[in-house]
Amino acid sequence: MKVKLITVGKLKEKYLKDGIAEYIKRLGRFTKFESIELTDEKTPDNASEAENKAILDKEGQRILAKVGDRDYVIALAIEGKQFPSEQFAKELEQATLRGYSDITFIIGGSLGLSPKVKKRANQLMSFGLLTFPHQLMRLILVEQIYRAFMIQQGSPYHK
């Protein structure tokens, strides 16, 4: 199995890079992990709805170009389903049991995700109604992926 994380925008903060690198290293015991960082579009101040849509479409095209036809896709979206950690672990396990060898997570840019990306997703997932910086969300998501693997192993990490 391979886990892929597609994100829009550059990760700048060293402490976040270090945290993500640590969890990716830990995940190496269980799976191959690939992180794909895509360029974000510049959003002008006071952008019109049409400009925002065009930006979402461009970023969406870049995202979808990195998604395999047979990937199980989980896109982060505020309107997505919320999971307790144990259920999230089961969701990942079920995806592999259904024959998916690659699980791809997507975190959009500052405007979110295009409708085409959301439509392609097998699952929309939410971490709640709170707003998180997209860079911090990467660390939170990678930790939760690691936690899911530890839950599957019956490890006390989750306790």
UniProtKB/Swiss-Prot annotation:
Catalyzed chemical reaction(s): pseudouridine(1915) in 23S rRNA + S-adenosyl-L-methionine = N(3)-methylpseudouridine(1915) in 23S rRNA + S-adenosyl-L-homocysteine + H(+)
GO molecular function: rRNA (pseudouridine-N3-)-methyltransferase activity
Localisation: Cytoplasm
Classification via CDD domains: RlmH-like (cd18081)
Main location per the UniProt record: cytoplasm
Binding site for S-adenosyl-L-methionine: 76, 108, 127-132
GO CC field: cytoplasm
Principal EC category: transferase
EC number(s) on file: 2.1.1.177
InterPro entries: Alpha/beta_knot_MTases (IPR029028), RlmH-like (IPR003742), tRNA_m1G_MTases_N (IPR029026)
Pfam families: SPOUT_MTase
Signal peptide start and end residues: none
UniProt keyword annotations, A-Z: Cytoplasm, Methyltransferase, rRNA processing, S-adenosyl-L-methionine, Transferase
PANTHER family according to UniProt: METHYLTRANSFERASE (PTHR33603), RIBOSOMAL RNA LARGE SUBUNIT METHYLTRANSFERASE H (PTHR33603:SF1)
Assembly information from the UniProt record: Homodimer.
Entry function: Specifically methylates the pseudouridine at position 1915 (m3Psi1915) in 23S rRNA.
Family: Belongs to the RNA methyltransferase RlmH family.
NCBIfam families xref list: PRK00103.1-3 (NF000985), tRNA_RlmH_YbeA (TIGR00246)
Protein's name according to its UniProt entry: Ribosomal RNA large subunit methyltransferase H
